[in-house]
Structure formats: C-alpha cells, structure tokens
Amino acid sequence: MSTIIDIHAREILDSRGNPTVEVDVVLEDGTMGRAAVPSGASTGAYEAVERRDGDKSRYMGKGVLEAVAAVNGEIAEELVGFDATEQVAIDAAMIELDGTENKGRLGANAILGVSLAVAKAAADFTAQPLYRYVGGTSARVLPVPMMNIINGGEHADNPIDIQEFMIMPVAAEDIRDAVRMGAEVFHTLKKELSAAGLSTGIGDEGGFAPNIASTREALDFVLKSIEKAGYKPGEDIYLALDCAATEYFKDGKYVLSGEGKTLSSDENVDYLAALVADYPIISIEDGMAEDDWAGWKALTDRLGGKVQLVGDDLFVTNPARLAEGITRGCANSMLVKVNQIGSLTETLKAVDMAHRARYTNVMSHRSGETEDATIADLAVATNCGQIKTGSLARSDRLAKYNQLIRIEEALGEVAEYAGRSILRG
C-alpha cells in the first residue's frame, strides 16, 4: 500500500518570482506527498548543482523545465514501484541514476524535490507528522529562531556589506513566545528606521533594507529596537550575523565596499572580534570565505570558545566538506540547507556527523523560498535547537514560524524550547 505509483513535477514560482521545482509523489493507497524546492542567492561553490534551462526566452534563462522533465521521465521510471518508506534506498537510487559528484546531470533541485515529497508521503502513510516520522520519539526540541531583521549583501539593494543582522530570543518560554518577541522588535525597528528617515522596504528574507553602509550603525539600530521593545540585549535577546564573506572576498582580501575597507584575513578576524567585544553577538555565519581555511582556523581559535561560528558556504551541508573542517579545527557549527546537498538522506548524515563532532546545527531556509514549511519539521526532527528562516514578514518566511507553533502545540507537555541551552562559554 505504500508503493509509489506516480511521481509528477511542475514548474512553480518562488518568493523572488523565479521558477522552482515542485513534486507530487502518490502512493498506492492514494496518499500524496508534495514538496517545493528552495533556491539561494549567495551560493557556495561546492553546493550541489541546481539545474536551470538557460533558455533566455523564458524567465531570463532561469526556467526549470529540464529538471521537471528529469523528474517526470528518468526519475519516475526508476522509482515507481519502490516502497516510499525506504527513504535511504530511494535517495541512493536517484544519486546512482544521476551518476555525478554534484548531481549536475539530473539536478539537485529535481532529486531533492522527489526526496522530500517521498518523505512527506511516507509520513502521511504511517499517520505521523513529518517531524515524528523523520526524527522518531526523541524529536521534541523547538529551535531558537535566528530572525533576520536587517538585510544587506546579496539579499538587498543597499550598501551594507554584511548580509544578515539577526536577533535570537533565547529568554522566550516557548516558540510562540519567541515569535512574539521577534515580531515586537521587528515592528519597533520599523518605527526607528522610519523616524530616522530611512526606507522600511524589505529584502528577500523579509528584513528591512535601509540605505546605511556601516555595520555598526545597523547593529545600533537593532540594539535600540530591542531595548525600546522592552527587552535586554545580551540577556533576553542576543544578536547573530551572517557575513556571507565569500561574496566580498576578492583577490585574497575582504573588500567591505560599503565601509571603504579592504582587509587581510587576519584583519578581518580582528574586525569581527571587535564587533563581538562591543555587541552581544553569539553567532557569526560565514565570517570568512569558503576557501580561506587559514582564516577560518584563525577565527575559530580567536572566537570559537564563546561564539558560535557557523559554516554555510564552508560546509554546504556536505559530509566530506564538514569532515575536512572538523579535522582542520575550523568553525564549530554547520548551517543545514537541504538543497545544498540535494537529498534528505545526505542531509541527515551531515547533521549526525556534526552532532558527533560536538558541532551545533542550524536548520536554514534559502533566500528564494516557497510556502513549503518542511524545514520547520526537519528542525524539530533533528533536534537542531536553532532555525534560520527569515524575518517576521513575508508569508514564505512566516509559514515556517507558524508550522513550528503548530508542532509545539501538537507535542504538548513534552515540547522543549532550546532557549539558553544554545549559549556557549
């Protein structure tokens, strides 16, 4: 009855108005699982390949009809007849069918869409929510959100070099309380920016994108908004950054064009250390470029004892890249993006490897999202303890927060909010 009888993909639009892949998997008893694939703007060089058509006459070359055809053709032919509960075997079959190291033939967007839709169908077939089906009875930890309230870098049309300025409500009693705290700070920040004559337009991930160039000015606005909302920075709510440093790493230097600075690797470490000394920052993502291993080691040696140093472009949710980072002593946390590696099985393998090495995990969205809230379930399933899914605006972001609220309600008394347990040092 849990046999796959049909797999169908279609081209839909993501939150940036770009095409992406959506997949339906239908089982013999009529159960159907559906998944939509996200897409990133600042992408790591080592990510699995997202297949785009390149036909400039459609969607400026960003169409995904070839990936859709791969699902409806080769992949469907391979997987129809499989038992949907055999996730590992199904993912392995698709990886073998693709035959490349980076899923470049069929496309990671094709493979991932099927992988997640299969998991959803199997969860429904077994009458379990997705977080329980994937995570088992131990899945009960609700993650602390990293709420991106000021956008810069590749996510906004402004001169801010650092890509994301985030708040983390560690003092919340539960996820519902955390969302409320974040929303209150978000709305307070809007008033502060407006009062300063700055734009309150939002970026790709729902955060504000004001026309300011200084990292410290952005941080000051966030601190002031936390305080005016009635909370204490560094006690109730902490700060987190996503530098996306690979985006401004040019010819061996870190070029902060918004601030008019060009820094060596060591100087960039000093720059970040000074921010940590002056602000209640507990997490920095991609503080160094993806190939600057020496810089990552220096940053980890300098700040790793007290700050979570998250590898996104560095690790790309890839067990091989993560293993190298662990061996080199670089970073102490991994950002988890299912589309970077391209299958649920490989994602879970990377998460487990990070856990075993005492690295933390942060479940993450992409800047190009849909209403699909799968990552909320996966955050709980893997007991990540942290989730990064944008600001308190745009329904593509709020879909994940709302799903976490539902999951917490369903878990009842066994639900645990990670809260202060994520703090280091």
UniProtKB/Swiss-Prot annotation:
Major localization listed first in the record, in broad terms: cytoplasm
Signal peptide: none
Annotated catalytic residues: E205 (proton donor), K337 (proton acceptor)
GO CC annotation: cell surface; extracellular region; phosphopyruvate hydratase complex
Residues that coordinate or bind Mg(2+): D242, E285, D312
Subcellular location field: Cytoplasm; Secreted; Cell surface
InterPro entries named among the record's database cross-references: Enolase, Enolase-like_C_sf, Enolase-like_N, Enolase_C, Enolase_CS, Enolase_N
UniProt xrefs under PROSITE patterns: ENOLASE (PS00164)
GO molecular function per UniProt: magnesium ion binding; phosphopyruvate hydratase activity
EC number(s) from the headed UniProt entry: 4.2.1.11
Requisite cofactors: Mg(2+)
CC cofactor note: Binds a second Mg(2+) ion via substrate during catalysis.
Binding site residues for (2R)-2-phosphoglycerate: Q163, K337, R366, S367, K388
Protein keywords: Cytoplasm, Glycolysis, Lyase, Magnesium, Metal-binding, Secreted
Annotated catalysed reactions: (2R)-2-phosphoglycerate = phosphoenolpyruvate + H2O
Pathway: Carbohydrate degradation; glycolysis; pyruvate from D-glyceraldehyde 3-phosphate: step 4/5
GO biological process, one term: glycolytic process
Family named by the database record: Belongs to the enolase family.
Record function comment: Catalyzes the reversible conversion of 2-phosphoglycerate (2-PG) into phosphoenolpyruvate (PEP). It is essential for the degradation of carbohydrates via glycolysis.
HAMAP family: Enolase (MF_00318)
Protein name: Enolase
Protein source organism: Ruegeria pomeroyi (strain ATCC 700808 / DSM 15171 / DSS-3)
Higher taxonomy: Bacteria, Pseudomonadati, Pseudomonadota, Alphaproteobacteria, Rhodobacterales
